[in-house]
Amino acid sequence: MSTLSQDTIKSWTDPKGPVALVLKEHLVPVEGEGGVLFPPTYADVGYNIDELSEGTKVVTVDSVGSQANRMEPIFATDPDLQPLVPQVAIDLGEGRQISLLEAGHRLGDAIVRSSSLKDDARSAFESFLDTGDSTSIAKLAPTSLVFGVWDSRDTQAKLSRIVQSVIRAWDVDVLTRS
């Protein structure tokens, strides 16, 4: 794998630069090369295995949502990353709190609508719908822009995630434990 220069990385911010960056990395199961891996199962399909037109079978090992659910809380727990985003704690009563970074639907979560943050959140979503400007959302919950948000119970504002991470295994065979 080659090392990227600072000039190359800075060039990505040019408006005529790339619209997406893709990193493909060869991963090996904990057991080593050729080891067996059991991916997650889903209620309606079991293993999420797709077959490409030429016959290659590809399985989802870790989904976009699952990856986001692990990345986002790091901004609350890693001392080096905490200063990068507002640390908003929502009071649940009886001395309990939850970080907005732990709310499953980010700024669009029901817990926000039942907190003192609800008016600010609504105003931020309405501003986005009216002007296309997401600055107010970024000030309240920048990870809502990074990992996506949908205010499904109120304004219906929906912002697509800008970071997608997924792990897939290629050329797989279906095995069972028995």
Predicted regions and their residues:
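RAMP-family (Cas7-like) RNA-binding scaffold and associated basic/acidic loop-rich RNA-contact surfaces
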Residues: 86-178
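An N-terminal structural lobe/cap that precedes and organizes the functional/catalytic core
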Residues: 2-106
